[in-house]
Curated annotation (Swiss-Prot):
Gene name of the record: yidC
Keyword Transport included in the entry's annotation: yes
Record Pfam families: 60KD_IMP
Coiled-coil features, chain-numbered ranges: none
Name of the protein this chain belongs to: Membrane protein insertase YidC
Source organism: Clostridium acetobutylicum (strain ATCC 824 / DSM 792 / JCM 1419 / IAM 19013 / LMG 5710 / NBRC 13948 / NRRL B-527 / VKM B-1787 / 2291 / W)
Region of interest (Disordered), residue spans: 233-254
Keywords: Cell membrane, Chaperone, Membrane, Protein transport, Transmembrane, Transmembrane helix, Transport
Length: 254
């Protein structure tokens, strides 16, 4: 309990410092709080970049391994124990951690809980941002403008999920990923409807940041893997060519 309270208090103090800094530049609470939330989100997401790289790299590598995994599943479908051993052996050979993407999710939940406490503790009742009339309030059916942020939150959750998980060559894997993304988006839409606008704003900005970040990381990781693949192919071609040259020399001597 002490550790949780300490984390919550740390986030409150950190956000308060950011808000004071923003307020000195933009002395209007209807802008400073919203801008402070956006800046806080960018800082948190920047600190989590190493974990995001690990998650996305793991996804790209797992996707690249799908053809080989399929072959193993077909070859050893009658021997589950052997299949598991060979699968783990393949992961080890390719330096792939199948659970490499889980750490980011585990880290994000305590942060989300701490921010819930932050926005609950702050006196932001009546303070708005852009079209948001009150950052402390949840969405209501009576005011359609409060629907916008939860809907955007759900939509960006779905798009972020698509970009974070590179397209798979396996139709079953694609279907599973799509179903998971839709389910997560609906869940986050429901959560966004029941949380304060301040927390939903954090999650939405976090998704937008993640989308841009994922695009950059996937492009870089894919290019690196392609370069490594081409390098291996070039090395194989050189070796084959050297072998052929040696054979030709022997034949000429004969």
């Amino acid at each position: 309990m002490f550790k949780i309270n300490a984390l919550n208090n740390l986030f409150v103090q950190f956000f308060d410092s950011i808000n004071k800094f923003v307020y000195n530049i933009v002395p209007d609470k209807n802008y400073s709080y919203g801008l402070a939330i956006i800046i806080l989100t960018i800082i948190i997401k920047t600190l989590l970049v190493p974990f995001s790289i690990k998650q996305i790299k793991s996804s790209v590598l797992m996707n690249a391994l799908q053809p080989e995994l399929k072959k193993l599943q077909t070859k050893l479908k009658s021997d589950p124990q052997k299949l598991q051993q060979e699968t783990m052996k393949l992961y080890k050979e390719k330096n792939v951690n199948p659970f490499g993407g889980c750490l980011l999710l585990i880290i994000q939940y305590p942060i989300l809980i701490a921010l819930y406490y932050v926005f609950y503790s702050l006196h932001i009742k009546g303070i708005g941002f852009l079209w948001i009339h009150d950052l402390s309030q949840k969405a209501t059916f009576s005011n359609w403008t409060t629907w916008i942020l939860p809907i955007v939150s759900g939509a960006t959750t779905y798009l972020s999920g698509i970009l974070t998980m590179p397209p798979s060559s396996d139709p079953a894997q694609r279907k599973q990923t799509t179903t998971m993304n839709i389910g997560m988006s609906i869940f986050l839409l429901w959560m966004s409807w029941n949380f304060s606008a301040a927390l939903v704003l954090y999650w939405t900005v976090s998704n937008l940041f993640q989308m841009a970040q994922s695009k950059i990381i996937i492009t870089a990781v894919t290019a690196k893997l392609e370069a490594e693949k081409n390098s291996v192919e070039d090395s194989s071609n050189i070796i084959s060519q050297n072998i052929d040259n040696k054979k030709n020399k022997k034949n000429k001597k004969k």
